[in-house]
Amino acid sequence: WPDDDIAKVLKNGWCATFVYHCCMQIGFSLPIRVPNSPCRLAGVNAWYQWSKAANLFTKDSATFLPARGDIVIYRNIVPPEKKDDVNTPTDHMGIVVFVDQNGFQAAEGNIGNENMSGVIHRKHHVNIEGFIRIDGKYEYDGWKYDYKSGEIRTEPFTPTVPV
């Protein structure tokens, strides 16, 4: 990440970084941060904001069935004494790997802010904010944003290469 102090900022909060890494490994091109926002996709709230703005987020409901590959965003699943910011309800995330009628299994990094990863079974509709589904229609548009100035480009960005 571009910040020198990112390890201090994230502390043990690396579930979003785990999800980001998994997405990059399978070939998704994702922005590093939410355009015109201080949020980076190293944090759950940034994923929440970004996915809503990109129309990739579906709020949890009895009519929505998650599928393998969906990204799940949890709400108040981390105990308050282990949270860095108790005012942020979207506090954990993972990747759905299996769905059954009782719930789903998700691959998660930093489960319960205990600095460990694993595959864990979660019940449907319990502490779930919603799901991000990045389908074949998703197209990376990060080139449109100048993250330093906040300006929106209208032409594709071509970096200059020193000769």
Model region roles, listed by residue range:
Residues 15, 43, 123-126:
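Alpha-helix initiation/capping motif
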Residues 2, 15, 48-51, 144:
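Short linear interaction motif-like sites in intrinsically disordered regions of transcription factors
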Residues 7-12, 29-114:
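...with weaker cross-activation on analogous glycine-rich loops/strands in unrelated enzymes
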Residues 1-32, 155-163:
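N-terminal capping segments
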Residues 7, 20, 24, 53-56, ...:
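A generic structural signal for solvent-exposed, polar alpha-helical segments
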Residues 76-163:
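Aromatic- and glycine-rich peptidoglycan recognition patches
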